[in-house]
């Protein structure tokens, strides 16, 4: 795809040079990765961002590991055919738990994954009970249990897997109201506890999008923790130390696997996040 320079302001004698920036790809199966993108953009507002989401295979939570690995490799490979990438963020917990080794083996650029914020939650809990709210797939994976054993061994960790909350977050971004009673029903296993978790790890990037609704339902004072800020800091460090040589002057762009009526409804939302266009990515 040819690179189109951004129009600069003109002087009386010449047009200013376009701003050249490293290209960073943020990938998720759905729109949850926008929560991570927002954190990165806060620290690095002037990068060239691509946001790719797999609206054909969404959600990934119940997909097999082999499927997710092959799918994500294919998508990132397709994006590299459009732009030389400085860095990729896999802003999807389900994908991060299984794809990072394969991605790092294939590509030379840094690949950053999402890790549930178990370690900071274990430090912050006051009653020694940490909740992990994630997809059912993430809750079941050995990687997640290893994290808990390594960083929260002295805490009691209550895991709750839900695919419905992912759908609720997606629907919210599409402009649909959130049914608080449905959120309450999903969280009942914790709400019925005599002493529920006082610190909850949002182990899916969709869940920060509904943090207000979660706070309405969970006991007052419950802390919600996600990995977005840590990923943003890691991205800053990598770009400062990698010094990418290939730069772009293009506008930020969103990519999906299929243009549907539902994805068209997302265009105003994506524009509010700074993405000028939405295009179909061919695999």
From Swiss-Prot:
Keyword check for Cell wall biogenesis/degradation: yes
Active site: 92 (proton donor/acceptor), 204 (proton donor/acceptor)
Enzyme Commission number, as recorded: 5.1.1.3
One of the Pfam families matching this protein, by short name: Asp_Glu_race
Gene3D superfamilies, alphabetized: 3.40.50.1860
Source superkingdom: Bacteria
Database matches in InterPro entries: Asp/Glu/hydantoin_racemase, Asp/Glu_race, Asp/Glu_racemase_AS_1, Asp/Glu_racemase_AS_2, Glu_race
Catalytic activity: L-glutamate = D-glutamate
UniProt keyword list: Cell shape, Cell wall biogenesis/degradation, Isomerase, Peptidoglycan synthesis
GO process terms (BP): cell wall organization; peptidoglycan biosynthetic process; regulation of cell shape
GO MF annotations in UniProt: glutamate racemase activity
Enzyme class name: isomerase
Heme keyword on record: no
Positions contributing to substrate binding: 28-29, 60-61, 93-94, 205-206
Pathway the protein contributes to: Cell wall biogenesis; peptidoglycan biosynthesis
Annotated PROSITE patterns: ASP_GLU_RACEMASE_1, ASP_GLU_RACEMASE_2
SUPFAM superfamilies in alphabetical order: Aspartate/glutamate racemase (SSF53681)
Family: Belongs to the aspartate/glutamate racemases family.
Function per UniProt: Provides the (R)-glutamate required for cell wall biosynthesis.
Protein name per UniProt: Glutamate racemase
Organism: Erwinia tasmaniensis (strain DSM 17950 / CFBP 7177 / CIP 109463 / NCPPB 4357 / Et1/99)
Gene that this sequence comes from: murI
């Amino acid at each position: 795809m040819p690179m189109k320079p951004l129009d600069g302001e003109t002087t009386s004698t010449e047009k200013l040079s376009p701003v050249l920036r490293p290209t960073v790809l943020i990938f998720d199966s759905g729109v949850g990765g926008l929560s991570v993108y927002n954190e990165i953009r806060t620290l690095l507002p002037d990068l060239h961002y691509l946001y790719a989401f797999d609206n054909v295979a969404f959600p990934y939570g119940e997909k097999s590991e082999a499927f997710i690995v092959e799918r994500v490799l294919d998508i990132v490979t397709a994006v590299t055919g459009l732009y030389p990438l400085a860095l990729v963020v896999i802003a999807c917990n389900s994908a991060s738990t299984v794809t990072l080794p394969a991605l790092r083996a294939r590509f030379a650029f840094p690949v950053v994954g999402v890790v549930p914020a178990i370690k900071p939650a274990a430090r912050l809990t006051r009653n020694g009970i940490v909740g992990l709210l994630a997809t059912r797939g993430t809750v079941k994976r050995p990687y997640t249990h290893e994290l808990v054993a390594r960083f929260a061994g002295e805490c009691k960790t209550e895991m709750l897997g839900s695919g419905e909350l992912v759908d609720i977050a997606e629907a919210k971004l599409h402009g649909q109201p959130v049914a608080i009673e449905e959120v309450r029903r999903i969280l009942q296993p914790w709400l019925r506890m005599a002493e529920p978790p006082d610190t909850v790890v949002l182990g899916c990037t969709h869940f920060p999008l509904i943090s207000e609704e979660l706070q309405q339902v969970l006991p007052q004072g419950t802390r919600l923790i996600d990995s977005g800020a840590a990923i943003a800091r890691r991205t800053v460090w990598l770009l400062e130390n990698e010094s990418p040589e290939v730069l772009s002057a293009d506008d930020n762009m969103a990519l999906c696997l299929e243009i549907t009526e539902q994805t068209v409804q997302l265009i105003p939302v994506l524009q509010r996040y700074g993405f000028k266009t939405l295009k179909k990515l061919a695999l």
